[in-house]
Amino acid sequence: SLILAIYPLLQSEFSLTFMQIGMITLTFQLASSLLQPVVGYWTDKYPMPWSLPIGMCFTLSGLVLLALAGSFGAVLLAAALVGTGSSVFHPESSRVARMASGGRHGLAQSIFQVGGNFGSSLGPLLAAVIIAPYGKGNVAWFVLAALLAIVVLAQISRWYSAQHRMNKGKPKATIINPLPRNKVVLAVSILLILIFSKYFYMASISSYY
């Protein structure tokens, strides 16, 4: 949300066209969306507790580059780094939310989602106060928040590692799916189409309006 919020500044500084603004959104979305299932698939097989602070390090790198960017190419790379941070962070963070739920998986996931939505809504407000009056160089102030997040996530990763070691020797529960495979595929396909259409409109509106 922070990158979207400073599109007017980027457009003014680099004289961006609508196509170039769309390319920034595309770069971020590709890095944050398409890479995420790959990371999730890998961490299902090989859990990576330290991917939480590692993901935030990618985000921090993207913010630093965005603050210092002197060209459109650097802005694209910054967007890719921030998106990669999201991809690396979210699969394992969802697992941590489930592990910490105490069996109340729905509540834990809801709180996790609310936290993300709150951050997304807060980003533009902070950008209006901290960045808009002074220029995109002030994006560097958000690096402090990223550094604090890395410290907190490192502690969570230690807890996650300890929990993983404790559960490593326990037999995994057998999951029985009573639904036919074709019905599962159909339901997931419909869900993907709905999500795609939702974010298609959201990205279009937020990028240009």
Q: Each predicted region: which residue ranges?
A:
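Flexible cytoplasmic inter-helical loops of multi-pass small-molecule transporters
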Residues: Q155-L179
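Cytoplasmic helix-loop-helix junction between adjacent transmembrane helices
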Residues: A78-G115
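Conserved MFS/SLC helix-loop-helix module at the cytosolic interface between two early adjacent transmembrane helices
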Residues: L34-F72
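Extracytoplasmic gate region of multi-pass secondary transporters
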Residues: I3-L4, L186-Y209
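Helix-loop-helix hairpin linking two adjacent transmembrane segments in secondary transporters
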Residues: F112-W159
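Short hydrophobic/alpha-helical segments at membrane-entry points of transmembrane helices
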Residues: G73-A79, L191
